[in-house]
Amino acid sequence: GTQASLGVKAVDDTSGDEITPEVSGLYSWTNDDATFGVSVFGSFQERDSGSRHSSVEEFGLRTWDSTNPANLANLGIVADATIENAPNDGQLVYRPTNLGLGFNEDKRERTNGLLTAQFAPNDEMTFTADFAYAENIQDSTSLIDGLWFNGTVDYVEYDGNPVVAAPVIFAEDVSGGKDFFFQNLAMGTKDTLESFGLNLDWNVSDQLNLRFDLASSEAESGGNGPLGHNVLRMNVAGATAGWQAVDFGQTIPQGVASIDDSSKGNANGVFDAADVGSQVTQFTSSDQVAKIDQFSFDGTFAVSDSVEVDLGLGFMSSEM
């Protein structure tokens, strides 16, 4: 007989596209004698989402020593800085070196398929063959804006934590302008799996059952980003920050910078394209292929109602 089913689902994710689909279907057929049958299963799923994030690099622990200018310099603080709620001498503090604020847009497509065929010419013998396919594609774009600290912090306020003191406000005045960064990333991966199997189950007699299995699988993983790479990272920067500060006391840290393009820009007092310069562009690629071939032959011989003898042999080859 024939049987079929179809499922359709829509997912509402307000962080990406409002509605993304998921479709799956199953079909099976057997002949009138129930000696031969085929089944097919397939599914497709698409997801879109987004996220916002912040990051602080070099969570570096230092020891506070207000009497040692070198210790302050090690924290990126100038000797005559204004320090609010200063830690006690000998207390641990940490020094942030930058703040990055950004967002991601992510997309994923997943496809699965399975084909199975079975043939039973009689009650004692059954042949089964199957083929499976799976594909998962993920793409992501990211934009990050951020500030680097130059090691000339002239105002800092600490949070008063008695274990590890952390800055709440970190600010510095940079004469002549310094850079702040814009990082663009495009990332993509594609994973595929193909697997084929063949099986024979044979009741030779009431006492002897033989089983034969053969399987071959290959999985491949690689880049699906620009030019086939996993990651494209492109950085640009504007060297026109005259004063900058970060407020770590917010739910999401906030950063601000004033523009001074008098020495490293076009001196028009406006941050524009002429104040931006290219930085590092980096490609990252990673590819992997794994293959597994398997073979097994085993059987069971019933000597009596209480005694059985199992026998078999197997082989497996793995390559990566």
Give short role names for the model-derived ranges.
Residues 81-92, 174, 267-274:
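Acidic, glycine-anchored loop motifs typical of Ca2+
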Residues 1-80, 105-111, 124-125, 207-208:
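Outer-membrane beta-barrel translocator/receptor signature
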Residues 14, 184, 240-252, 283-287:
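Generic amphipathic alpha-helical segments used as scaffolds and interaction surfaces in large
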Residues 85-88, 162-178, 278:
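A broad structural signal for short, well-ordered beta-strand segments within beta-sheet-rich domains
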Residues 46-82, 134-170, 218-267, 318-320:
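A surface-exposed, glycine/aromatic-enriched loop/edge motif typical of exported proteins
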Residues 2-6, 91-94, 276:
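Surface-exposed beta-strand-to-loop junctions
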Residues 9-10, 19-30, 45, 96-142, ...:
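Outer-membrane beta-barrel transmembrane strands
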